[in-house]
UniProtKB/Swiss-Prot annotation:
One of its GO terms (biological process) is translation. This is Large ribosomal subunit protein bL21. It holds the Pfam family Ribosomal_L21p. The keyword Glycosyltransferase does not apply. This protein binds to 23S rRNA in the presence of protein L20. The keyword Phosphoprotein does not apply. SUPFAM superfamilies: L21p-like (SSF141091). It comes from Vibrio cholerae serotype O1 (strain ATCC 39315 / El Tor Inaba N16961). GO terms for molecular function: rRNA binding; structural constituent of ribosome. Keywords: Ribonucleoprotein, Ribosomal protein, RNA-binding, rRNA-binding.
Length: 103
């Protein structure tokens, strides 16, 4: 059984027991989160596709941890001007474990 849901402007295909990183959620570690923007639920041959959302569809997850991703370096370089600008960025994320899929 798997489902496709929307969170943080992105769509994720998940199944029970899977862990994934989402955009940062303002929820405490160990808390339960419910995602109700479910776009598709499939259980073997039984597939429910929403238009745009599946009615009564819900993905339940448990927050494992919060953290920051790998550093991305941003460099702006002007040729022949002896000028450059360097910056780094680390995006916050929330890691969740999928505990249930309801349709």
């Amino acid at each position: 059984m798997y489902a496709v849901f929307q969170s943080g402007g992105k769509q994720h295909r998940v199944s029970e027991g899977q862990t994934l990183r989402l955009e940062k959620l303002d929820v405490e570690t160990g808390a339960t989160v419910e995602f109700d923007k479910v776009l598709l639920v499939a259980n073997g041959e039984d597939i429910k596709v929403g238009a745009p959302l599946v009615e009564g569809g819900k993905v339940v997850a448990e927050v494992v941890q919060h953290g920051r991703g790998d550093k991305v370096k941003i460099v702006k370089f002007r040729r022949r001007k002896h000028s450059r600008k360097q910056q780094g960025h680390r995006q916050w994320f929330t890691e969740v474990k999928i505990t249930g899929i309801n349709a």
